[in-house]
Every structure is written in structure tokens, then in C-alpha cells.
Amino acid sequence: GMVLSEKQFWGQGDKASKILGLYEKEIQDLINQIQEKNNFPTFIDIGGADGFFAVGSVVNNLFKNCEVFEISKRGRQAIEESAIKNNVADLISIKSEANEKTLSLMENINNSVILCDIEGGEYDLFSENLIKNMYPSNAIIEIHKNSNISLNEFEDKFKNLFSITKIIQEPRSLNNFSELKNFNDNNRSLIISEGRSYVQEWWHLSPK
């Protein structure tokens, strides 16, 4: 299993849900499902934060290698530390900014699973050229609220090449964790909280 860093650059409050395997469980399960069908060699993580998905993708032998982009220097350091701690540093390439150029030049951009979580930057990142270049990869985009562009407009960008499945965050249950039965309701709720201000939505893009 993956060893988590004691000091987390991003989402310190998410540590309990990560330990229990509940953090963004919808996405963990989806990546597993995609790989069962396709067995892509490369995982591309755009907005890697502290490396939970990037490092986990190769620790669990789901992918041969990972390319992770994180704009924050502290974040890149956290990913590197986590990769070293988990003995997978040679399988992970850590880069700073993801843009149309840096992504389109990647060898496996069209043969990978792409996970994107960049706090609203997704609307600018996914240009017509990038969408063409990444086909027929699978992509998972975390959708953030943005008043400058409608979701319908954003969806239209992909429709020629990709089918879109919308995934909505599901309620978490701790009933299977006997070690938490003596925790009060408030503490149990905090353990599974991901601190979101609204119910999260992700889009899974699969090639037509």
C-alpha cells in the first residue's frame, strides 16, 4: 500500500479519508475500471497537489509510469518526497505548468489516463488542439464552478471525439469500519468530509 506523508501540502484535513481509502472514491474506482478495459501505460495527473493520485497510480501497479504537473513549488517538492518515500521516484516525472504545448508534446498524450483538477483552469486548458491530440486517451476532469463559461459550452468542445459520463459525488458510509464505531457522529462526519463547498462533479471522457 501507499505510505502517506505526515506533512501534506494540500488537503491536510483529507488525511483520514485517504487512510480509509474513501478520498474521491468515485475517481479511484473509475481509474481502476478504465485500466481493467484498456491497460494504458501512462497516468497523466494535471494538478497533482501532494501526489496522492500520481504516486498511488504507480505504487499500486496500475500504470507503468506517471507524468504529473503541479504549478506550486511546494507541491512539486511534496510529490517528490512522497515518490521517494514510496520507492517509485524513477517511475514519476514531475513538471510545473501544464498547457496545450507541454501536454501536446508528450509521447503518450494519446495513450493514457488523464486526470485534471486545476481549480477552474480546465476551461482554458482544453483547447480544440489539445482535445484532438489527446484522442483516444481517457480523461477525468474535476468540474469547478465558473461564471464566465457555461457547462454546455464546455461540453460542446468534446462532443465530436468523446462521450461524456457525468459522475456526482456520492455520500460516504463508515459502517464497514468497526474501529470507528465508538466515535461520535460529529467526528465520524469530519473523518469522511473532503471539505467541499458543494457536491462535486467530474466528467469522464471516453473516446467515441
Protein language model regions, located:
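S-adenosyl-L-methionine
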Residues: G1-K73, Q77-S82, N86-L91, S104-I109, ...
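Conserved RNase H-like, two-metal-ion catalytic cores of nucleic-acid enzymes
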Residues: I140, F154, F158, P171-R172
